[in-house]
C-alpha cells in the first residue's frame, strides 16, 4: 500500500459517494446483511445516491423477488440478484444514462445465530460503471466473519459494502490498494476475504489469479484457489464433499505451478 494512503472512515466514504451526483444506484440485501444501505442513509444526502433498496429476510419473500433457489447464501443467488437489480435500474432510469454512473449492490449473508452453532459468511457483489454510458464492470467477493457476536458481524459487513463502492470509484487503478481498502475501519482478524473477482471492460488487464495471490500476500486470507481455466474459486464451496489430494509444488512465476 502506498505510504501516502490515508484511511478514510466509513461515514466519510458514504457521504462522499452520496455527494457525487454521478453515482446512482440500488441496494439489495437478503438474509442478515442489512447494514450496507443503512450506512449511506445514516451519512446524510442518501437521495443523491440511492434509487432503490430491497430487503428480504423470509425465504419465500426472497423467492418471490428472485426466484426459487436451493442455496441462498451462494454465488449463483448473488448473481441472480445483481442481474435483476441492474437490469431494472438501467431500464427504469434510461433517461439519466448520459450523466450517471449506475451501480447495483447486492449481498446474501448468514451471520452468527443466537446459539452460535453456525459460521458467519456471505457473498457480496457490485455491478457498476466507471463512466456514464459505458458497459458495466463487476466485483464479487466472499467473506468469512470471525467476530463472536452477530451484531458485530453485521456492522463489519456494512463497512465492507461501503468500502467496496467507494473503492471501485477511487482505487480501481491500483488493485492492491483497492483490496487493502476493503478492510478500512475493521480491526485485524475480524473479516477474511477468501475470494475476489474483478471483471468488465475496465478490468480486462487484470488477472484474477494474481488478485487471489494479493489476498494471501496481504494477510486477508490464508489460501487462494483457482481452476485450470484461470477462474478464481471459493475454496470451501469448490472442495465441498470432494476427495482431496494435496501435492507440494512451487510457483515460478505465480501463474504456473511446477510439481
Question: Model-found features: residue ranges?
Answer:
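Non-catalytic terminal extensions that flank enzyme cores
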Residues: 1-251
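Histidine-anchored nucleotide/phosphate-binding helix
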Residues: 256-259
Amino acid at each position: 500500500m502506498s505510504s501516502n494512503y490515508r484511511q478514510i472512515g466509513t461515514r466519510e466514504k458514504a457521504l462522499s459517494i452520496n455527494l457525487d451526483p454521478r453515482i446512482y444506484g440500488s441496494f439489495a440485501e437478503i438474509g442478515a446483511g442489512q447494514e450496507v444501505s443503512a450506512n449511506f442513509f445514516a451519512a446524510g444526502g442518501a437521495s443523491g445516491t440511492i434509487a432503490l433498496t430491497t430487503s428480504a429476510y423470509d425465504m419465500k419473500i426472497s423467492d418471490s423477488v428472485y426466484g426459487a433457489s436451493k442455496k441462498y447464501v451462494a454465488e449463483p443467488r448473488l448473481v441472480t440478484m445483481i442481474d435483476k437489480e441492474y437490469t431494472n435500474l438501467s431500464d427504469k432510469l434510461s433517461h439519466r444514462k448520459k450523466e450517471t454512473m449506475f451501480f447495483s449492490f447486492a449481498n446474501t449473508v448468514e451471520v452468527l445465530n443466537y446459539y452460535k452453532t453456525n459460521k458467519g459468511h456471505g457473498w457480496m457483489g457490485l455491478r457498476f460503471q466507471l463512466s456514464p454510458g459505458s458497459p458495466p464492470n463487476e466485483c464479487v467477493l466472499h467473506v468469512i466473519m470471525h467476530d463472536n457476536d452477530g451484531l458485530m458481524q453485521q456492522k463489519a459487513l456494512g463497512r465492507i459494502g461501503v468500502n467496496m463502492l467507494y473503492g471501485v470509484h477511487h482505487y480501481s487503478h491500483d488493485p492492491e490498494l483497492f483490496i487493502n481498502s476493503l478492510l478500512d475501519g475493521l480491526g485485524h482478524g475480524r473479516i477474511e476475504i477468501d475470494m475476489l473477482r474483478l471483471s468488465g471492460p475496465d478490468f480486462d488487464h487484470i488477472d484474477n489469479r494474481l488478485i487471489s495471490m494479493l489476498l494471501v500476500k496481504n494477510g486477508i486470507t490464508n489460501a487462494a484457489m483457482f481452476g485450470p481455466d484461470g477462474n478464481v474459486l471459493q475454496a470451501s464451496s469448490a472442495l465441498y464433499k470432494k476427495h482431496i489430494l494435496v501435492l507440494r509444488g512451487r510457483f515460478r512465476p505465480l501463474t504456473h505451478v511446477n510439481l
